[in-house]
Amino acid sequence: MKNKEKYTLSPEVGSVDYNNLPKELFKKSKIDAESLHDQAFETKPVSYLRGALMRFAKNKASVIAFFIIAVIILYAIIVPLASPKSYVNSVEYPNGFQDPYFSYALPYNKIFKGSGFWDGTEVKSGYSQSDYNILSYDDSNHNPIVNVVSSDVNEIRIGPRVNRFTSYTLRTDSYAIGNKVITVKPSEYEKLVSYEQERGIYQSKGSIMKPFVDSATYLKEYRDEMAQDLLGISYSEITSADQSTKTTIDNVIDSMTNYYNQHADIYYKLSAKTSSGEYSQNSFSIIFSADGAPETIYQEDSEGKLVYSAYNTGVYTVRVDYFDYFVFHNGFEPYYLFGANASGQDIFLRLASGARFSLLLGVGISLINIIIGIIWGAIAGYYGGRTDLVMERITDIISAIPSIIILTICSIQFTNNVALRGAIGEAGVYVLAFLVAFVYSGWIGVAGTTRMQFYRFKGQEYVLASRTLGAKDRRLIFKHILPNAVGTLVTSSVLMIPGVIFSESSLSYLGIINFTTSGLSSIGSLLNEGQAAGLQNHPHMLLFPCVIISLLMICFNLFGNGLRDAFNTSLRGSEN
């Protein structure tokens, strides 16, 4: 057998002397001795992190949650940088972009324009004839009525008289806010005139600047018409004998004056005379010209020309179609993807800024708590004994004080500290108070988990073997014990982020802390604004912040579960 051939004992051999076996009892084996050796691995070894990634990728729910979180993070980063509303004049908008004229504007998406869904329109019922007239006869460039959904004629019988009135259901455009009287600097006025002249719309139909409305002059004329109709004389000729008629005229004119003041967009003549020939103080009808258009009451100068502007004390007063003026002044259309709040701020932009602030706050506080908790728990769990006993009693004392009390104390003390407010600002004071309150006891949970894991693994054979070979405490803690506890720690750490976000949102929603007054916005402050606006009247203000915070809570939970399984060393090999 010098040639390394393999022989096996024949199975037919019976009882033989095994000390003296003859050669003929052996036969040649079919196994080649040269092939009896270890074979090289055909695949590369899987590292710890790669194995964790492979295990994480197998959890589809966690992968989807990760991408949703990534989208929200990108949304929070990109939108404040890309939105033109972020780059408006800081002198004109010291607290960021806002326009009260677009208060509670509805969500608008160009993709759905004209569909009745997410296009800035809404359907409302209960419009009276006068309401319909005000909206229908509008001299702005954008009529607020999209279409008439329905109109119902109702009757009310009072004795022998039957009063008929029409009730309209209309779809209106929340961005068609009509004409507004504003003041502009001379330089801005010159730019506006040049802008209109370049486009050939200066003082013509479709122009941004509209003629002033002079209701006072018309009402003075109408007062004389009433006196002439009732008494056959002018108003100034009325004597004390006709005092009751004069009182009636005064009451009607006062009512019409209030009506014009309440509806500044009315540019046409109104009549208080009813079909029965009496004068009403409550309902007014439009006076139409022969061509069917309302008779206007535009202001005219001494030459009979329409007045489009007035200069006084260094500024121009103009009446403009506000939507078109906004585009001219700011360079972009005043559309709000998620709608606007009571101050006319863009919810889409504020929600991105709020999500960014909430995420940074959550990640920052969680990171600090994780570092403190791991160090504290590692020392207590590794050394145990009296060290652990003392550290646990300190932890018990700290955890006995609620964080809300710490937050209240810090808010009061930091706010009253003039030097601190001057150094970090009002916003910094609130952030610092929140940071101290949640770092004060937020690390205790991580410390307890770390301590438990160290008690679990410090007595394992591989740790004892490393200690026998002379490994120092630092190497045992960070090289051998801590990596095996990473799975559990990662899960609790990741779930800490949505916990901080939810705590901040809850406190802001309840009004305990208010970042809005300091110029900051968070998801919680947006929820508080939505709750104050009312779900029934302005549901969009509450809907979108609720969706974002719900996605964050659910996705961080699923993401944390996926990381727990990925970093669990007992599952190593399950990815194959």
Q: Residue spans of the language-model regions?
A:
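Membrane-topology segments of multi-pass transport proteins
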Residues: 1-58, 78-343, 576
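Aromatic-enriched hydrophobic runs in primary sequence
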Residues: 7-9, 14-41, 48, 73-75, ...
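Aromatic-acidic/polar surface patches that form glycan- and anion
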Residues: 45, 60, 548, 552
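Short, solvent-exposed loop/edge-beta patches enriched in aromatic
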Residues: 57-62, 356
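Alpha-helical transmembrane segments of integral membrane proteins
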Residues: 60-70, 340-576
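Short, strongly hydrophobic transmembrane alpha-helices
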Residues: 61-82, 374, 550
